[in-house]
Structures are given as structure tokens and as C-alpha cells.
Amino acid sequence: MKRVWLCGLAFVISACTPPLAPAAKADPDIPQWKTSNSMGCMMVRACKDDTKLITSRKDLGSGYDKYAYELNTIFAATNKIGIKVYLAGDKYFTPKTRGLYNVKGNNLFISEDIIDNPEMVMGVIRHEGWHAVQDCMAGSVTNGMSALVWTKGEVPSIVWDGVIADYADTPQAIPYEAEARWAAYSNYKTADGLVACANPRVKIWEEYPPIPSTKQWLIKQGYIR
């Protein structure tokens, strides 16, 4: 089980979109942008300048028609769950970071720097959206925890190899990032997971039978018997 403040840094395969939501007023002084400090300020919503709430595919602008059904499904689910998706200024993100999901605040952020690249934006939404699925799989999106959904064998070895190389300094994140990266490459996996999370009648672990470590956690916390 993983408790994280920042859950998921989507690298080269990520991106998102513009739209509505007024800019915030005075933000805290940030001594240096494009750092973990500026990302953290954005994630906890202490910094709101140059961030826009997006609630539908239309907020992303043109070029997303080929992903219409998948995006409509994702936004319908995130809106129902209460996950807020923001398009944010590139100044907040560390180099190579294109998206973030905050497991404690249930906020998903996409760098506006990639908005004109629908393929990259879709990768980011799928990747960070899968971290929201992991959040849900830990029992509730309100408990600040994440749980694995798939067994190691369900993620292709080539994906594992890339994630192991990228996250050598944070090995505890590797299985979570491997799942998210595989979801980013896959049509509808994130959409399906978020739909399961948003279903008020059926728990997500009834749709996705939990792997042993996740099942143990759910039993220990009283989510299942």
C-alpha cells in the first residue's frame, strides 16, 4: 500500500487542455519555478494562478474528436467521483513532467505546454487517471492511499523495464507507475476503471478482483470481510 503526496509524474507521454475557471488572486512567493516546490504549491491549491478547471472534452479545444467517447466517459466519471481536472501553466512542472495526480486532494493536473498535442494529452489523462483508479482501489478516494490493481504479469515486461529505469531512485513507486504507464498506452483501461470507481452500487474491487496485497489491505481496513 502506498501513501503519497504526489502520486504519479507522467513523463514524455502526457498532456492536457484549456477552458474555464477564473485565475486565483495572490499566490505564495515561489523562489524558483519548475521545481518540486512549485509543483507542490499547485497540487495543494495554494498556487492557483494560471490554472483552469476542465470538466468536459470541449474544454480541451479542437483535435480531440478521435478520443470523444473515451474522454466523455472519463470526464463523466471524474465529475461524478469529485476528481477535479486542471490545465496548469508549464511554470509549475519540473522538467519532463507533464501531469500529476494528488491522491490527498483528488486533483489531476495537466501541463498547458502540451495542449496542442492530443496524443500526449490523452496519455497524460490516462496515466494520471489510472492513479485515481489506484486511489479508489485502496478503499476510498478520501483516505489518501493508493493500491495496486493488476498483478505484475498483467503489465508487459517492456513497460516494466522502462519504468524500472525511470524510477530507479524511488523503487517503491515502480509497480504503481508501471500500471499507470500501461494504462496510458491502452484505450479505455482508465475510462473503465474510473467508471467502476464512480459506480455507487458496486465497489471497484468487485469489478477488479483485488490482488493478494490489496485484498489484505481492504480486509485490514474493514472494506471487505
What do these predicted ranges mean?
Residues M145-R225:
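Metalloprotease/metallohydrolase-associated module, dominated by Zn2+-dependent proteases
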Residues L108-I125:
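Short pre-active-site segment immediately N-terminal to the catalytic Zn-binding motif
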Residues G129-S146:
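Catalytic Zn2+-binding segment of zinc metalloproteases
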Residues Y67-I74, V121, I125-G129, Y176-E179, ...:
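Stable alpha-helical elements in mature extracytoplasmic
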Residues L20-P31:
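Short, low-complexity, disordered segments immediately C-terminal to signal peptides
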Residues P22-A23, N37-K104:
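Auxiliary, metal-adjacent structural segments of Zn-dependent hydrolase domains
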Residues S14-A15:
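C-terminal motif of bacterial Sec signal peptides marking the signal peptidase cleavage site
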Residues K2-G8:
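Sec-dependent signal peptide recognition
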